[in-house]
Amino acid sequence: MDERYDEKNQGTWANDAQMPDILKDGNILAKETAKKEQAEVLGKWLWILFWLIIPSAIAGILSNENLFGKESGVYIFGTLLSMVVGILYGVILLPMRGVEEKYRIAGIFSILAAVLSMGLEVIQVESPLMVLVIGLPTLILGLIAKYYEFHSHAAVLREFDLEFSQKWLTLWKWYCVIIAGMIVSTLVVLISFLLAALLILAFTIGTAVIAIVQLDYLYKMAKLFRQYA
């Protein structure tokens, strides 16, 4: 076998075919070790993230002013729980930035969205204009956070399960459809209250479905990385 070094890059082999088996094995072992280390980090934090979705869903129900009045203790507790969980969600995303940098952006924007949401509740804004001024940035921050979170999940899965990786990108598209639908539904109120109510109901169900699918994906993802590590 003609084993020669690359003339332009001394100390490296011209191509993989010319690399001695012992070096190939060393490279494979190094890559596998790195993947296991990444899987260990991801498995740990994604598992915590999975369990955090459950209190988040409970908080979403308890903080629904249509089910419980704004003055009720249940609503206040649900609102506080929602804010705390929102901040924790962002904090938990941050440690995974060592594997994928997009997790850092997702974490920061998740925290900012939760803090703005908290401000909206604390100030008790009644003016529709002020609700729009504070609520719109909160919505935008939340969308950016979800974009980077879902794309981070897709990125880290690419080396482990490409099909699963694509599912996160598809879920992001459906998430955008649901958000757009909710916005349109609120505008339809100006035309038909009944139609708006039906649309809001449909997209609320869609939101629940997205949350369930996300929960399922997080569980499978955490399980995959924990087993790999």
Predicted regions and their residues:
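Low-complexity, intrinsically disordered extramembrane tails and loops of integral membrane proteins
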Residues: 1-40, 223-229
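Short low-polarity hydrophobic stretches
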Residues: 17, 93, 150-153
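Hydrophobic alpha-helical transmembrane segments in multi-pass membrane proteins
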Residues: 39-92, 97-147, 168-219
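Membrane-helix boundary/juxtamembrane motif in polytopic membrane proteins
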Residues: 151-181, 223-229
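Intrinsically disordered, low-complexity regions enriched in Ser/Pro/Gly/Gln/His and often acidic
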Residues: 5-7, 38-40, 44, 161, ...
